[in-house]
């Protein structure tokens, strides 16, 4: 089992990536679910009364596509019913199953933050429900979009970086997105409060 009571769970249409922080270490770590691989394909399969995910699900999909569901995130957001083999499942339940399988190595999760390309009230409720299903207290489950996550990341960087515009790029093999963090000028130049904006460009 892996220690990591604080989990960051990056979830998009095609992959997920897990970061974790253990109070005994200085820096967050990125979880490698295979040698040198931290991006987990967002696919879930069921064969011979066993669930498989990620690369194993991709291999199963090549042999038996009807036993694997892809675009799991999109289907869950749309609250679809999905057939795997001979059974029909709720896509939200399948996404919860996927998240649970990917986090089996962590023994004591006390905080979890889900990061997604965009958020809305329904998605936030869905992901918070999945967090509670994992046994995390509801007040310790957070949902943020990539813009907010970028802000949080930059706030903990050296302040010298804040005098420049900063960019974050996202690429999933099909699309590239760029986000710019800009410091805003306040009307009263003597105000010490700092305001920033993050725009997709």
Region spans (language model):
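Phosphate-binding glycine-rich/basic clefts of nucleotide- and phosphate-handling proteins
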Residues: 51-53, 175-176, 180-201
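Short acidic, glycine/serine/threonine-rich loops at helix termini
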Residues: 20, 124-128, 152-157, 179-182
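Hydrophobic, small-residue-rich alpha-helical packing segments that form membrane-like cores
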Residues: 130-135, 139, 145-166, 172
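Glycine/Thr-rich phosphate-binding loops that ligate phosphate moieties of nucleotide
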Residues: 76-108, 125, 130, 198-201
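Phosphate/ATP-binding catalytic cores across multiple sugar-kinase/actin-like superfamilies
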Residues: 1, 93-106, 149-161
């Amino acid at each position: 089992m892996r220690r990591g009571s604080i989990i960051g769970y990056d979830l998009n249409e095609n992959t997920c990536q897990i970061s974790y922080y253990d109070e005994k270490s200085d820096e967050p770590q990125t979880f490698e679910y295979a040698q040198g691989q931290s991006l987990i394909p967002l696919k879930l399969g069921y064969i011979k009364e066993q669930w498989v995910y990620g690369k194993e699900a991709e291999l199963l999909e090549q042999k038996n596509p009807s036993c694997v569901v892809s675009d799991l995130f999109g289907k869950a957001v749309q609250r679809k019913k999905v057939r795997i083999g001979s059974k029909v499942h709720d896509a939200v339940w399948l996404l919860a199953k996927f998240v649970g399988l990917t986090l089996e190595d962590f023994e004591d999760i006390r905080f979890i933050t889900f990061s997604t390309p965009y958020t809305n009230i329904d998605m936030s409720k869905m992901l918070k429900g999945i967090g509670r299903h994992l046994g995390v207290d509801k007040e310790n489950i957070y949902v943020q979009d990539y813009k907010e996550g970028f802000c949080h990341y930059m706030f903990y960087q050296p302040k010298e970086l804040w005098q420049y515009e900063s960019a974050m790029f996202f690429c999933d093999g099909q699309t590239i997105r760029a986000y710019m963090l800009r410091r805003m000028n306040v009307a009263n130049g003597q105000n010490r409060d700092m305001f920033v904006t993050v725009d997709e460009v």
